[in-house]
Amino acid sequence: MKKFTVLTLFPEMFNNFMTTSIIKKALYEKLIAIKIINIRDYSIGKHYQVDDYQYGGGEGMVLMIEPLVAAIKAQQTRDSVTILLTPQGKQYVQEQVQQFAANDNDLILVCGHYEGFDERILYYIDYELSIGDYILTGGELASMVVIDSVTRLCENVINTQSHLNDSFSKNLLDYPVYTKPVEYGGHYVPEVLLSGHHQKIAQWREYEALKKTWLKRPYLLEKKILTTEQQIFLEKIKNEKSFNDRRKEKNSYEDEFNRRNYKRSTS
């Protein structure tokens, strides 16, 4: 059973998270365990202090090293991995998700707040992770991302085929999916999906997954060893007039968006 321990100043943020959807199911069936620890329980003095002004001056309060280390050491075991959630960390990607899910280590997730952590915390953790190049109020949402993504890959949580088809699992985005009605607003479900021909459907999905990846995340294909069939599909995709028009339109939109932002930032 995979165990997650979250160190946070705001335990109440996890109430809904733990009682909803896949996480609720995994907890109920004892496929995972989640323990929420309030860092203030390890605070200093009668005022439960966990932060202070930074040396050298500057805006914002800094989380103190003493309560953080005390909280971490109280939860660490020989089999645990301690993860600091910070925008300065390594980008969290699907390969890391798979690694965390595959090994037997329990995960301790340390959530920051305020201006950040006393830098000396780095001596007491194993990983620094970031879920993206943007700033959140604290690490709580990031810790939920880690728990959710790893839980999905834990044994018996969801159907194996479901997560194998997920975007990024094979360095491909997922193929388009449709449900009822067959027609809406003049837009139709592709005929091949209604044909009942399983081989043609599988080929269509492979083709469309490659197409979507090439348009939206082309760098993913650099990591992937393509089959002969996929190589043929990709060449066909690159030569599609309608597809190339869409790509030019997307690039034109992004160029205009960046141009406007640059103009706004320099005016």
Swiss-Prot record:
Enzyme Commission number, as recorded: 2.1.1.228
InterPro entries (alphabetical): Alpha/beta_knot_MTases (IPR029028), tRNA_m1G_MeTrfase_C_sf (IPR023148), tRNA_m1G_MeTrfase_TrmD (IPR002649), tRNA_m1G_MTases_N (IPR029026), tRNA_MeTrfase_TRMD/TRM10 (IPR016009)
Main EC class the enzyme belongs to: transferase
Region (Disordered): 245-267
Positions contributing to S-adenosyl-L-methionine binding: G112, I131, G132, D133, Y134, I135, L136
UniProt GO MF annotations: tRNA (guanine(37)-N1)-methyltransferase activity
GO term, biological process aspect, one: tRNA N1-guanine methylation
Major subcellular site: cytoplasm
Subcellular locations according to the entry: Cytoplasm
Any Pfam family matching the protein: tRNA_m1G_MT
Gene Ontology cellular component list: cytosol
Record key words, sorted: Cytoplasm, Methyltransferase, S-adenosyl-L-methionine, Transferase, tRNA processing
Basic and acidic residues bias: start-end ranges: 245-259
Reactions performed catalytically: guanosine(37) in tRNA + S-adenosyl-L-methionine = N(1)-methylguanosine(37) in tRNA + S-adenosyl-L-homocysteine + H(+)
Subunit structure: Homodimer.
NCBIfam families reported in the protein's UniProt record: PRK00026.1, trmD
Family affiliation: Belongs to the RNA methyltransferase TrmD family.
Function in brief: Specifically methylates guanosine-37 in various tRNAs.
Protein known as: tRNA (guanine-N(1)-)-methyltransferase
Organism: Spiroplasma kunkelii
